[in-house]
Amino acid sequence: WFIIKMKKVVLIKYGELTTKKDNRNFFINSLKKNIFSKLSNFEFDIIDDYYRMFIIPKNDDIEDIVIKLQDIFGIHAISIAYSSEDTDVENIKNMSLDIMNGFSGKTFKVVTNRSNKAYPIKSMEMNNIIGGHILKNTPFKVDVHNPDVYLYIEIRRDAVYIYNK
């Protein structure tokens, strides 16, 4: 048996805000202000980590938070992700398997984004490691062109985030 230390967070991708390099901080701060305003009834922490924001709810209101964020200008995509500060490959394998076991479908694809370039395992290698682990331990098959389930893995400076849309 293994113990997985992961928590649910809201991953926010912001799009066009970062194309205006000179005004980047202004737009990001404006987006943050809008998020705080929309979520004024919730308790949460927010992490701004270059091209992403992560909202860590202090209660179980993650679904309500996602709904509130839907119409904020500047947000490109919102996902519920599972995060862990343990970025060891064994933990990522266990997290990925646990998350995949919650999905229905027959095929999958792993997509890794390694913004932490100091991380020793490259993105394609991580795709293969995690994909192999899922293949061995579930009935899922790989389909890189049209999978039923995408499993996204983001390896950042201080944590790993895993989500499917």
Where are these regions (language model features)?
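RNA-binding accessory domains that recognize and position tRNA/RNA substrates
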Residues: 3-165
